[in-house]
Amino acid sequence: MRDLRGNARYVLPTPIPVTLKTGVQWREILVQQLQLGGSRRWTYVGTGARPTDPGLTMFDEIKTGRRTPQWEATMFIRDRTLINPTLWSEDVFYREQQKYTGTKEVTETVSAAFVMAEGKLGRQGLFARTGYLTGVRIEGTANESWGWVRQRFGSTAAEQQADPVRAAARDYANTRRNLKGGYTKSFPSTHLTHDFTSSLRGRLAWSTSFGRPGMSNWLPNESVNEANQTITVNNPDLLPQTATNWDATLDYYFEPVGNLSVGWFHKTIKDYIVSGVNTGMIGSGNDNGYNGVYDGFTRLTTSNAGTAVVQGWEFSYQQQFTFLPGLLKGLSGSANYTAIETHGNFGGNINSETSKVVGFIPRAANMSLSWRYKRFSTRLLYNYTGSYIVEYSAAAVGFNRYRMPLKTINLGLAYMVRPAVNITCDISNLTNAPQVWYRGFTERMQSTIINGIAVSFGVNGRF
């Protein structure tokens, strides 16, 4: 990555101070993958079963009682070399194929500039208690990529076995794709603050924001379904998801050392990124973008296909309980809760509700309780993350992927040996809560990850 940037700041000599700031940035990210030696794999051709590793216990055995034989790769290969080559036959076609599919490159270049102003509306009275921050960022992004894809009618298994090097070249050598894309966008924003009293502050903001698509979207990729006459490709012209945001917050500060905050937010997201979008039929002729093949096929791709609206509330509270008697005065606590409702339209006349809009967690909460006494301190943290959708496809709604609710408890302990040295003990996921994903409905579990309970000890020092 290469990054160049410069900023300038100037305070206007006016009765009401105004600070101006401007800046420019140029950034280039190059991601290159080379598989010159190729990835390799082998097939066992021996006549007898190989010894298994009895020390491996799998989740399936714990849940069902079945004992499935398990092997570790280090039992058969060391330093990328087979321990006993006579027992294995290499898939040479796979190795040669990976030299093409594993070699690719993508470059993203961003050129941007911004200007902003900050100050107060007045010097005295009501306007002196009102501040502002406003500005705009203009950004241009260009991307280029190249890579190999498989030709429509690949080599047969017999051809791959007889001459794997030539078969791989036949499948890939003449189907290198070079893609380009880009966009230019501006992102203005305005933020206001007002102190109603010494302990009550209000905030109001209108802003625009964006989220760039992943760079993998710009790499050449073609997945062909001959039965359905479709080809799924990447889209190098994907725009960023943009959002117009309204945020309003009230903060109340109280003694001893406490804060209560209530916030409301509303976001309108445009150019929402959706996969499996039908972008039309591929034409005929050598200039159809696919060397003259796939005419009549339906092109499916990832596209900026609609809008989403997100709004909700945030509540937070934190306080030190120094007014309590005795040992309890070392207590402090905090809590926050977020509730989100979403809906979106990704093409057609059907609006999708919260359960179908990717990237948002409808319900989330955190609570913590801390206690400090002399050199000893401890903290208990509870985290709740509600169920949410992870993957959405307009072409296969029944296979949308969701994550189940997750509740975790973490405990932290610390002892101050001296002001510059602390000993710590942190226990994560105290209840060993698993992460569970499912497809379509909760009974169709896709995967479960048991993270386990992690205990870590540390020494922190300042010298």
Could you tell me what each predicted segment is?
Residues 1, 43-101, 160-175, 278-303:
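Flexible glycine-rich, low-complexity coil/linker segments exposed to the extracellular/periplasmic environment
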